[in-house]
Amino acid sequence: MQERYQPNSVEAAAQQTWQARDAYLVHEHAKNPDGSEKPKFYACSMLPYPSGKLHMGHVRNYTINDMMARQLRMRGYNVLMPMGWDAFGMPAENAAIKSKVPPAKWTYDNIAYMKKQMKAMGLAIDWSREMCACDPKYYKWNQWLFLKMLEKGIAYRKTQVVNWDPVDQTVLANEQVIDGRGWRSGAPVEKREIPGYYLRITDYAEELLDQVSTNLPGWPERVRLMQENWIGKSEGLRFAFPHRIAGADGKLIQDGKLYVFTTRADTIMGVTFCAVAPEHPLATHAAQSNPALAAFVEQCKLGGTTEAEMATREKEGMPTGLTVTHPLTGAEIDVWVGNYVLMTYGDGAVMGVPAHDERDFAFARKYGLPIRQVVALEGKTYSTDAWQEWYGDKQAGRTVNSGKYDGLAYQAAVDAIAADLAAQGVGEKQTTWRLRDWGISRQRYWGTPIPIIHCADCGPVPVPEQDLPVVLPDDLIPDGSGNPLAKNEAFLSCSCPRCGKPARRETDTMDTFVDSSWYFMRYTSPDNDQAMVDARNDYWMPMDQYIGGIEHAVLHLLYARFWTKVMRDLGLLNFDEPFTKLLCQGMVLNHIYSRKTPQGGIEYFWPEEVDNVYDAKGAIVGAKLQRDGSEVNYGGVGTMSKSKNNGVDPQSLIDTLGADTARLFVMFASPPEQTLEWSDSGVEGANRFLRRLWALGYAQREAVGRGLATGADWAQAPAPVKELRREVYGLLKQADYDYQRIQYNTVVSACMKMLNAIDDAPLPEGPAADAARAETLGLLLRVLYPVVPHITWHLWQDLGYAEHLGDLLDAPWPHVDEAALVADEIELMLQVNGKLRGSIRVAAKAPKEDIERIAAAQEEVARFLEGRPPKRVIVVPGKLVNVVG
């Protein structure tokens, strides 16, 4: 055994042995030595995009997964921990444009490097199940399921106003528009009308909502709430404002009815205007004869189409000059075009009730529109000068200024108004959803080809199943001018499957969220080229633990749930939900340093380039560049980012201090679900702990060898031996509990305390002490093994544990020796007249009389009682003894 800890050689030796043994190859229905079947556990991290290198967020995510997998294997579970690559998407195209190489080469080069990094981390991944989204063997099944959905009417083609990213030249889903900008390019999003394929996720809205509310107790509450809000079920009333507005053909536009939806039917008598979306037929009609309105409509097409984007945008409008009729009062109501109204939500029109809706109130104040109060609350004074929250209190209010509906409570007013509108044939109660069908068509090259052929005679024709996959050419180099598939004759040219005439392939590819909606099931059946999934999927799924970032709460997780339900309804699955438990790990943060450039931009500096300036309390208040002493701004801590020069390269850390140091730090520094603030001193502390562990093993190697060979009778062991065993087993019990709670930072803390206890124990020489050293160090190595597998495995080998107990890879999780936790002696606090004066040690089962006698005989008692005899002695069992005199 080498005297000093050398992480590179230790980790290389461990990994070579594990790879030669195929240590992490997993099979279904694995058996115990007695022939019984092991329980299964499927633990999976969200698959990475192969961007080039791992970042510390990856290291944290995968180490959490690896700790869980290793510890559960020790507990006797058959654990699956797979890995794959979310390999399609725009970044590969952008990189290809920049480097002038095909996206396929860039992607596969990155995969090779990142896979090497993952292996260097010592992750217990079954690489035989690896999948890659850009492999035709994988995306064939995207295409196959799309065709099945097309047959069932779940997939369909339509023309609709969409979010268009002018830089990436593609359609974005609502969820991919952040603050009015494309989530990848950052470009302002435009609205365009374009044909594409959609999936009817709205058909599953009720089930998606019901199950996320009631059937996912293992998910974080905030994620469930985010999905509930995104699905957005609303119970309300859909009704029409009649009108006589005719189009150029002389027919009434939309049959003379402007439909709106409201959840506040009790306020209908307060409508003073209606607003329609810029794409609404009434807006289009009015704009034909109004140049100013036409210009406003075009302006509205800039920006996204999400509710979140609309909520932050300044509300603007323009009158159309058109009016509709209030269905209950007969009053003429002005129609406006509003930039905050979405054509894709409801009927593309809203009623304006300024007195009882904050958005409408602001709009009416801005444009001088009437504000009519129709709900009053006792004790509240109505005013049109400023919005007051009580206006929206529907339960406490009563209707006013509402004719025959005056004096009604919310539900009574809703029911009465709904009944009258229904009787007129212009209204009915209805449930609506914020959720919209999922548009999957993308005008980009690097994605799954949509298996459709366009024929001049037959129209869009599905590619026959036997012709799948439609293979994406992997040698194209994008030039930034749109989709290169549209210029590739070899891909485009084909024959119509229906009539045999020359035809053209669909050039749109699928949204990359299609790839990530089911990859975790392909891990279970990776080698099946005849079916999307097979019986092995029934064995592993649903997944027991999914691990990933909170940023995927709405996008990926909602789509994966929908995809699972579609596969179930097609007879491919026998379960409803894909993920039983979800852990959202916190971000990794680091310090941010910057200053403005002369050109008005911002220049960021690496933390190692600066020296911090501290205040009297030790807080960072500024920084100076090391190279010239000039000042830079300290921006606090934020998520590690290449753009802000505050990332830490995991490879550099692995090369210098080892993967175990990186793993130990990211697990110890913070609970898994909370943010982790990077600390160089914390990393050094983690490495120092590992050096101490190695030094302890080296120092006690001979004693451990003797102890493993001889054992001991613990009942007859000296008191220091019993005390060490009691302390270590107590820490084992705590670590065991914390492993089950996924509180891995406190697991590491327990291991550090174990090391201190073993290192500091004043053990006498002899067989019992040797056996105690062997036992307690062996316990520490097993508890610590899931965190830092390389050093613990190597010490296990070098110290002789493998010879006596087998390979650490196969070692069972240690059981707590309850007998070791029972103390022969206990310590009681000693008080004299209620004040703490020391402590005494007594037999754990000492009778009260013995405790009183021992306490009264203490020197401290005589001194503080000044020689007087005690009047009485009070014993609080297991805690203290108080001598009163």
From Swiss-Prot:
Signal peptide: none annotated. GO terms for cellular component: cytosol. Transmembrane segments: none annotated. GO terms for biological process: leucyl-tRNA aminoacylation. It catalyses: tRNA(Leu) + L-leucine + ATP = L-leucyl-tRNA(Leu) + AMP + diphosphate. ATP binds at K642. Keywords: Aminoacyl-tRNA synthetase, ATP-binding, Cytoplasm, Ligase, Nucleotide-binding, Protein biosynthesis. Belongs to the class-I aminoacyl-tRNA synthetase family. This is Leucine--tRNA ligase.
